[in-house]
């Protein structure tokens, strides 16, 4: 049996690029949620409004890898760097509580 994975991706936009970053991330929501292996894909804003945060859940590491090879992901990767004050902080998580799997 394959284990699900979750991803937390944190984005610190340049002050002049916040709207562009938001649009780029918004454009990822519908195609990513349509992927077979995607369980959830939600965009948040930190309480202080500084960061944008994606919380993603996939059925397996294979599903995450397939997402990272998709045309919409590759398009996002080609554009995101110029919109940030620092690189995206990505954490991949494995469940400890089997009920969350």
Curated annotation (Swiss-Prot):
Chain ranges of the ABM domain: 5-93
UniProt enzyme class: oxidoreductase
Superkingdom to which the source organism belongs: Bacteria
GO molecular function: catalytic activity; monooxygenase activity
UniProt-listed Pfam families: ABM (PF03992)
Swiss-Prot/TrEMBL keywords: Monooxygenase, Oxidoreductase
EC numbers on record: 1.-.-.-
Keyword Oxidoreductase tagged: yes
Subunit structure and binding partners: Homodimer.
Biological role: Putative monooygenase that might be involved in antibiotic biosynthesis, or may act as reactive oxygen species scavenger that could help in evading host defenses.
Protein name listed in UniProt: Putative monooxygenase Rv0793
Source organism (scientific name): Mycobacterium tuberculosis (strain ATCC 25618 / H37Rv)
């Amino acid at each position: 049996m394959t284990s699900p994975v979750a991803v937390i991706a944190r984005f610190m936009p340049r002050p002049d690029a916040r709207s562009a970053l938001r649009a780029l991330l918004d454009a990822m929501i519908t195609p990513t949620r349509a992927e077979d292996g995607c369980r959830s894909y939600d965009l948040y804003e930190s309480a202080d409004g500084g960061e944008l945060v994606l919380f993603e859940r996939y059925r397996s590491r294979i599903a995450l890898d397939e997402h990272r090879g998709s045309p919409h992901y590759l398009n996002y990767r080609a554009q995101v760097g110029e919109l940030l004050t620092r690189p995206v902080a990505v954490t991949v998580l494995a469940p400890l509580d089997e009920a969350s799997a």
